[in-house]
């Protein structure tokens, strides 16, 4: 007779971190939201792809909104109440991700844009001809 093996897997411990930082990386193809503690430890994350979108729909504002809601819900379960938002990238989901974070009940204390802008650096790729 086979014995049941008792599993002692690691469970996610509930932390109580009231203040955090939401990093939004918005590209043309996807939007990734990572919510961290002030020291930089990732508490929750979500992306348009992990929220169930595939292909070109990952780059839409609605996909960014869904990803932001998912990550905010995970962070609020860990006790988060107030966040600073750091945005990077030129994607279409930037504003909708911020609005979704506000709508979930998180208090936004600061919005900072750290999109890298070249001072005439590398030559950009050639224009698409469709």
Curated annotation (Swiss-Prot):
InterPro entries, sorted: Ribosomal_uS11, Ribosomal_uS11_bac-type, Ribosomal_uS11_CS, Ribosomal_uS11_sf
Disulfide cysteine pairs (residue numbers): none
Keywords: Cyanelle, Plastid, Ribonucleoprotein, Ribosomal protein, RNA-binding, rRNA-binding
Top-rank lineage group of the source organism: Eukaryota
GO molecular function, a single term: rRNA binding
Main location, first listed in the record: plastid
Pfam families cross-referenced by the UniProt entry: Ribosomal_S11
GO process annotations (BP): translation
SUPFAM superfamilies per UniProt: Translational machinery components
Localization in the cell: Plastid, Cyanelle
CC per GO annotation: cyanelle; ribonucleoprotein complex; ribosome
Assembly behavior: Part of the 30S ribosomal subunit.
Family statement drawn from the similarity comment of this UniProt entry: Belongs to the universal ribosomal protein uS11 family.
Cross-referenced PANTHER family: 40S RIBOSOMAL PROTEIN S14/30S RIBOSOMAL PROTEIN S11 (PTHR11759)
Descriptive protein name: Small ribosomal subunit protein uS11c
Source organism (scientific name): Cyanophora paradoxa
